[in-house]
Amino acid sequence: MHKKINCLDYLLFVGYLILFAWLVTKLNFYKNSQLNNSQLIIIFLLKVMAGIFYGWVGVYYGNMAKMVDTWSYHYLSLQEFELLKDNPKEYFTNLIYYPYAEGYLKFFSTENSYWNDLKVNFFIKILSIFNIFSLGNYYINVIFYSFVTMVGPIAMYRVMINVYPAKKLQVILATFMVPSFLYWTSGLHKEGLLFLGLALITYCLYFGFKQNHWPFKRILVLILSLILVLALRNFLVILLLPAVFSWFLATRWPKKGLVVFVVSYLIYGILFFTIRYADERFDFPAVVVSKQEAFIAHSGGSEVDVRVLEPTLESFIINAPQAISLSSLRPYPSDVRHILSLAAAVEIFMLLLLFVIFLLTNTGGANSKNFIYFCVFFAFSLLFTIGYTVNFIGAIVRYRSLAFPFLIIPMICQINWTKLLSRLTISEKK
């Protein structure tokens, strides 16, 4: 049963909304983004509205759209808040304690694993802190969450506007206005914090490599961001490491960046399939297979039939087309079951149309090609991982939202819009 909203909740909601809308115009990290106060406030309010809509969908269409998690997390955070009042010692230690001693060693496991359970426990702990100030109100927590996670898109914007300084409008639209990205990273779920971590890692590395300057603050933010990603979805760190190392090598041979990335990823691929023979604890193909088995074992309304993956090179090659199709092209029109899946299908169609336009009119123009290689290789490694392991369209749409900014922003910025618009104008005159 949902908590009844009273007048105090409304007053707190309005008060916090005004306070944080004011704060986004005062913090230096936001002020130095080249966005004016009106733009910052609009972006913040868009995130709040998306987060409220996310919660509303969870209430009225949660079972149909398979979005009950957000409210489950909220109720668990209320229990955690009560624990803070009744047993502060346990509250401050239960994130570290785990009942299965061997669970600390099961980094990739989906059962009796400290690391697998940490993603939920950590997120609930954060929400419980919000509850101290919101009195346990879900929608007030949305305001807090929007304020905190807005750092992620702003960090990505600051990187991309440095890469494409003459494309401010395109960077703004592609960073903040992609519907699925805005929706999934604004709701009370892990994606907002995950992108915060990924974006800050990208921000620190980009300006660190560019300036060849690594002050203590930058290194600290980088480490904390890695810990955040590790806590919420540990396999993302595994995907980040080869992308970051390749980027680092490319900074040493800047004119051979693409060759560096291709050769590096070929080596990573070989290690992925062979390192298990040196140490069976690093049987990465088996880990991916176990993740797929865990998803297949679940039931839901958006699952699709998939070819079962085996821990062999041949199986991964055979399943590659299915993997990229699942993660990049679904839902098809035939997959549409409700308004959210319809919206996802329309969005994918529009993005594919933009991709075709990009192929026909690509202007290049990035200040750092090696950074773009990093974006592409990391994003596609994430998409392949999703496609190999997940067979629920709803989860796929949510997970892939993290990859979108790394691909969509460069794509939008490198389309020759002047040429495209001139052709459309000529066509209209004819």
Regions found by a protein language model. Give the residues of each.
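Juxtamembrane segments of multi-pass membrane glycosylation machinery
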Residues: 104-144, 331-336
